[in-house]
Amino acid sequence: MFNCIEGVENKIFHGINLKYYSNKLEDLKIFEEIIKSRKIMSRNDLIKMRYEHFECLPRIYEQCENEICFAMHPKNKNFSSVYCNDDSLSAFYEYIRFNISFVFLESILNNGYSLQDGGEIRIPTSLDIDKDLVAIGCFDEIEYLLEKVNRGKSKNVMFSEQLIKCEDIHKYISEKKKRTYIIKNLLKKYGYNVPIIDPLTGNIIDSNYEKNIEDVKLLKKVLIKNI
């Protein structure tokens, strides 16, 4: 049983970023609509189908009515020239961090794309997701923050207020597990056989996996100290 997907740094990501939605639709609802339709749609296509939540669409779609926005992995060497030294300013962290994402093979770029600053990629068409989808990404926030702390870089980390303010670590982890479980069930419901991964590392996330409580308590102390 493998525990990660190979070559995650060469994959292309499309993320559900709730900060672009005007009335904060639940990302699980948007996720289900996408996997049910089996298509990531451009603004034009959403207009044609009279998309129920059109008024709540991300502003990002207004950049071009036919484009869809993606992000490359910050370790993608083929496009490293468009990244700045601060990973946190990249499209990957802007669109993928804390959000559900769709992970695709690089072959989705074969029909043309435009490359923007910060590792953003725009594809000039709607995308059928069955062919090139290899995984669903759920950012493993705790693993990411622990790795930063262990490397002595906690002062520069983009901490999570949700984690810091959470009084009950067990409840926090339980909610993370519940979310992964819901995503896994939705994938099964609509006939998808792809893993759920941490998009940064490619590690497969098991809905039964529980982070070490003491590690998370230590992490909270470090983050609070550096606010």
What are these regions (language model features)?
Residues 1-227:
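NAD-dependent ADP-ribosyltransferases
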